[in-house]
């Protein structure tokens, strides 16, 4: 697997699919004020992806769900339940978010995917903490997909 760590905006990456670090989908999407990647998706891509992910109901911690990309230029968005209902990321939630997002990448045969640093923003963990867990998890995955891990930079 080809993994690159880049600085920038996940919405500027030329990939087939992006990953959105979402919550467990317990609170209705329209009651939330999305921040970070979710906020950028809503602002630039509209509400369609969030309406779609709401139809799945509660998402188990670390699981992933596939939706359209709304008005964004991607084939799809993979939403991962990277934080618990107390808005906190754990090693389990980050590891399983990566594993389950990559499972969807493989099932859908996407050739490229961009991940944010899961758990580093709304998950109240630092960038280095998230990156360490993500790199360790990727090391155990076999895939032909190009993977970008995007560290947000303005």
Language-model features: locations:
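Extreme N-terminal starter segment of soluble prokaryotic enzymes
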Residues: 1-5
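Conserved acidic residues
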Residues: 16, 75, 111
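Short, conserved "active-site rim" segments that organize catalytic pockets and cofactor/ligand binding
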Residues: 10-56
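N-terminal short beta-loop-beta anion/metal-coordinating cradle
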Residues: 49-74
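Phosphate/ribose-phosphate-bearing ligand recognition and processing surfaces
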Residues: 82-154
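Short, basic/glycine-rich phosphate-binding loops at helix/coil junctions
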Residues: 72-85
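Conserved, mostly hydrophobic/aromatic
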Residues: 19, 78, 115
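Solvent-exposed alpha-helices and their adjacent loops that cap or buttress functional pockets
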Residues: 9-12, 69-72, 139-142
């Amino acid at each position: 697997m080809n993994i690159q760590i880049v600085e920038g905006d996940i919405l500027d990456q030329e990939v087939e699919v992006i990953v959105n670090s979402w919550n467990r989908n317990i609170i209705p999407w329209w009651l939330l004020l999305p921040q970070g990647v979710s906020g950028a998706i809503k602002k630039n891509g509209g509400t369609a992806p969030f309406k779609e992910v709401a139809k799945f109901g509660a998402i188990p911690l670390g699981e992933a769900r596939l939706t359209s990309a709304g008005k964004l230029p991607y084939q799809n968005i993979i939403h991962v339940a990277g934080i618990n209902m107390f808005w906190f990321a754990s090693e389990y939630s980050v590891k399983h978010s990566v594993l389950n997002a990559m499972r969807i990448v493989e099932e859908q045969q996407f050739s490229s995917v961009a991940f944010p640093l899961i758990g580093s923003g709304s998950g109240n963990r630092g960038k280095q903490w998230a990156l360490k867990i993500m790199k360790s998890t990727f090391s155990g995955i076999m895939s032909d997909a190009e993977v970008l891990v995007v560290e947000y930079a303005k």
